[in-house]
Amino acid sequence: MTRPAAPALRWLLLAVGWLSGTSLQLQQPALWPPPLLLALGLVGALLATAAWRWPRGGLSLVVLAVAAGSLAFVATSGRAALRLADDLLPALEGQDLIVTGVVDEMPRSSLDGTRFVLATEGATWRGQPVGVPPLLSLGWYRGADDDALLGGPPEELRAGQRWRLPLRLRQPHGSFNPHGFDLELWLFEQGIRAGGYVRARPEVPAVKLADTVGRPVERLRQAARDAIMLSVADPAAAGVLAALAIGDQAAIERAEWDLFRLTGVAHLMSISGLHVTMFAWLAAAVIGRLWRLNSRLLLACPAPQAARWGGLVCAGGYALLAGWGVPAQRTVWMIAIVVLLRGSGLRWPMPAVLLAAAVAVTAFDPWALLQAGFWLSFVAVGLLVASEPAHAERAAAPPGWRARAGQSLRAGLRTQAVATIGLAPLSMVFFQQVSLVGFAANLVAIPLVTLLIAPLALAGLLLPPLWALDAALVQGLIAALRALASVPWVVWNAAAAPPWAVACGLLGGFLAVAPLPWQLRAWALPLMLPLLAPPVQPPPPGQFEMVAADIGQGTAVLLRTHGHLLVYDAGPQYSRESDAGVRVLLPLLRARGEPRVDLLMLSHRDIDHVGGAGALIKALPVAAMASSLEDGHRLLALGVPHWRCEAGPAWEWDGVSFEVLHPLASDYGQALKPNAMSCVLRVRGQASSVLLTGDLEAPQEAALLQRAGATLRSDVLLVPHHGSRTSSSGAFLDAVQPRVAVVQAGYRSRYGHPAPDVMARYAARGVAVVRSDRCGAWTLPAEGTPYCEREVARRYWHHPGGTATP
């Protein structure tokens, strides 16, 4: 007679099924039709009922896991459908709307203005009520080069305030590049289905209506952040304290984030499970001690139970104050499960507790499964649990404080080694890099941050003078990290690995830290090698690969031959704190395994073409730069060997020919506008050819036709000036005769790029037009069919793609 499975095993398989079903749903390019989801939900419910009523045998466990997966798939699909139903109507994009709502969370200021989330209460368009999404991501900027903005955001903009705002909105749309940050996923996860900016004008001002009592946690967070910023003079230290006290990671400047990533301590600069656990432990200890002082309280509830529940409540409060991030959520759910199990007299194995916490997190936020923080957080705890020595081994505390201190030191070193080695494969998977000084940096940073800096940051909320001491500790830590970051080979970079290498690397990381026989652990390094140094297949000699990156309104193209890399333009500068180099090109180059740039060609000086060049030059070795930049330009002072871009120079790399066709040397003395000085580059391989044109305009197109009309024919044309009416003359298109035309322009470009009449010229000639706002990054492989990133990697939360001419 078969026996019922143990409850812990049943819950374990239920959790595995739930997580598997959720993961499968997140891979769908489009949501299933409602009838199909309804049928799947009914099947899942029937299977769950059968497995629960007849809980005997291994088959019932499999049925239970399948049922849980089916129900998770349906539940996630239903929530996704509700969010997609909140989408902004296309007819309202770019229109002047009047929206009333409440500031939903603490605003975040930058040099360019303030960003905030508005919980909407009503909207009108041309005096008529219209529907808008419940949450809007908005910018209120300081100054602009058109009449869209008046003044800037008010100093008193705070969470909980009700405003009536003139807005221009658009649907969520972000850059779409291989291995890039998925902005549309992040907005979808937050429930934000439109974004835009405040367009205050004298005749339609922004009006503050009231201060509400809502959003008390966000108001408290904002007050705490403002107090820290006023109390601490050093911006770097103030940003770290704000991140550790209230979870405001945006307060940390980009330079400090780069330093923390290089040295492997970035995980400490957000409120993590370690911080929440220590806070809960301290709160439980204090509550238990105080509880024992009152006999009536002891009669009502035992002190250990009161301490556990009190610690849980305090942990939840701290996690809310921290912004309820995934690591904090995971810890709160784990503590809650342990408290419930202890209260009921049950003891589950730690893997079951960990999986139950993962189910709780994904039940509230299924899209957390796609975030690096989810996997780093849960895998870190799982590795520490899996690598624990036997309980008997740990239970024997040696006599004497020195021996106990030595044991604690060894345990700390071992824990750090487990985290560093075990998480290295995941770091390579998500970031294509791992810090080589992370072990040493964390030996100092973990005790300093968790035992001193983070507690003092919190204590400063009650006693602000403590922040001055805490700031000094942060400054010392940053100085030490900078010294570590100055050593050679501070970080190991590698290309994004194929799935088989990822699987081998993750298995190797587990074997490296698990308490297994050495015969098995010896396989750890060989298994991790394909992930740490994955095979990269360059184009064969005589051929090249082209990637037109999706960088919004601007230009950035990668050209890779067998042994060389050319970057043509570096995209725009998005703000005074962000550019295409940092946000798009560096992650893309890192994922492709590009260690250096052989030639950086900047077509002309416009900011949408050179905005990311500085970041590129500072982060990667750049062998040479060619441009039409004027003498004295800031980029020429960065130490890269430079030659002036002018017609004539031609060279060959690995059997692929390159030739500069424009401008002429004589053009440099004529004070032409920047567009007229665009570097035009022709690239020819054995199988394909490309013509890169920058912002070339019609007069220069005509001059180029006279000089080289017979040799302009190319398979691919980078559409001049993003499809502006100033360019793409009919005669020029007839000479080039492209099969594909690539337009790099922003979504709903404020300049109207690409112009419909220009696109009609291409359509009349049978040219296939690829638009980056619809296609994402476009790749022309050396061998195979060209493809759009939005087509091959589409998920249901993404903005619709497409390559057709409008």
Language-model regions, residue ranges each:
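Helicase C-terminal subdomain and adjacent C-terminal extension
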Residues: 1, 5, 764-765
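Membrane-interface helix/helix-cap signal primarily in integral membrane proteins
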Residues: 2-4, 60-267, 578-590, 596, ...
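Membrane-embedded alpha-helical segments of integral membrane proteins
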Residues: 6-51, 371-374, 466-514
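Hydrophobic alpha-helical transmembrane segments in multi-pass membrane proteins
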Residues: 13, 21, 196, 248, ...
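Internal/C-terminal transmembrane anchor helices
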Residues: 56-79, 518-540
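Non-globular, low-confidence helical/coil segments that flank catalytic cores
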Residues: 100-102, 124, 149-155, 159-162, ...
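Hydrophobic alpha-helical segments of integral membrane proteins
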Residues: 213-231, 240, 248, 256, ...
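Transmembrane helix-bundle signature of multi-pass membrane transporters/permeases
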Residues: 416, 443-447, 720
